[in-house]
Amino acid sequence: MNTQSPKRPHLVVLSGAGMSAESGLSTFRDSDGLWAGHDVQEVASIEGWYRDPQCVLDFYNQRRREFVGAEPNEGHRLLSRLEDYYRVTIVTQNVDDLHERAGSSRVIHLHGELMKNRSVRDPFTTYPAEGATRELHVGDLAPDGTQLRPFIVWFGEEVPEMIPAIEATEEADLFLVIGTSLEVYPAAGLLGYVPAKAPVYCIDPKPVRSSYRPDLIHIQAGAVAGMRNLYARLTEGR
C-alpha cells in the first residue's frame, strides 16, 4: 500500500487533458473549438445551463458513459507508484476519476468530478452519480429539493479548489506539469507559486517555455512515455 509520509519530498503534479487522452477520453476541445461536436459555451457554461439544462445534462450523461469504459493508463499508475518514494499531491484539471482508480491518494480536482452530482442550491454537498442518478434529467431532485446537476465547475463559476491547489504548490519540493499547456491558466498561474528551489518538470510532446521558470526540465514525450522517463529519474538510487 502506498504511504504518504510527511518526511518524504513533496511532489506536486498538475495534470490535464493529455493525461486522460491516453486512456481514450476526449480532450477538452479540438482545433475547431468544439468539444465532442458541441459548442463549449453551450454545454460547459452557466449561461448554457440557464438556456437549456437538458442539453447540458445530455452532454454530461454521454461523457459519464464514456468515462465508465475508460481505464487508468500506465502514466496514472506510475504517478500512484511514486507515493512509495514521495508525498504526492495531484492537482488535476480533469473531471474523471482515473487518478483515484490508479491508486493516487491525494487528488485535488480544480474543475469538479463528473462521477458526482450536486444541487443547484448547494455547490459543496455532493452525491454519487450511480444507479438512477448516473444519467440526470430535468426534474431529478437533490435531497434539498432543487435540481441535480453535475459536480462540475463551468465557465462563469468560481474555482473553489484553487486555494488548496496553491497551498500545496507553495509547499512543493518538486513540481510536474503533464498533459496541459504551460501557456494557459491554471498551469501558468500555479507555476508562479512553486518555490524557487523546487525543480519543475514538464512532460509535453511539443516545445515548451515558461517566463516563470526558464530552467524547467522538459521531457518531450506524451504522458505515458514521459512518465516512464520521469519515474526512472525520480526513483533512481531510492
Each PLM stretch: what is its role?
Residues 1-238:
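Conserved catalytic core of sirtuin-type NAD+-dependent deacylases
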